[in-house]
Amino acid sequence: MTIGFIGSGNMARAIALGLARPALFSDSGSGRAATLADATGGEAVSTAEIARRCETIFLCHKPKQLSEVAQALAGFSGKVVSVLAATDLGALRAAYPKAKIVRTMPNIPVQYGEGVVAIAAESDPAAEIDQLLGELGRLERVPEAEFELATAIGG
C-alpha cells in the first residue's frame, strides 16, 4: 500500500515516524515535505503526484485548505484518513465523494507506536486501515457526535 501525506507538519511527522515506512509527502511550500521525506526514506512530491500514486492519503493540512486540497485530489477513490481538527465526516464526504473516509485524531506518542487514535467512520473501515492505524497504538472508535469531546479529552 502506497501512503501519501498532504501536509508535513508535526502530526504528519508523528504518524510517518510511527508507521516507519517510506511514504510520499507534500506541503504548501514550507519545505517540510523534503525534510520529512529525508527523515523517513520517503519522497517529497506534489499533491497531484500523491493522488496518482497512493492508495491511502493522510490529510494533515490545515482544515481551511480542505476545498483547495480536494480540488487537487479530484476524483480520488482510495482511502482518505483525515486528521483535520473540527472537520466532520459530512464535510469530508462532500470533499471526497468517491473515497473511503476515516476521521481520526491521533496523539503525538503515535510516533513511538504507543499513542491513542480516536477514529470515526461512516462504516467500518477496511481491515487494512485498521491494521495500518493499529501500528500507531490503540484505536478507540468514537461516534461522530462525540468526536470533538473525545479528542479534547484524549489530547
Give the residues covered by each predicted segment.
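Rossmann-like NAD(P)(H) cofactor-binding subdomain of soluble oxidoreductases
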Residues: 15-17, 40, 47-119
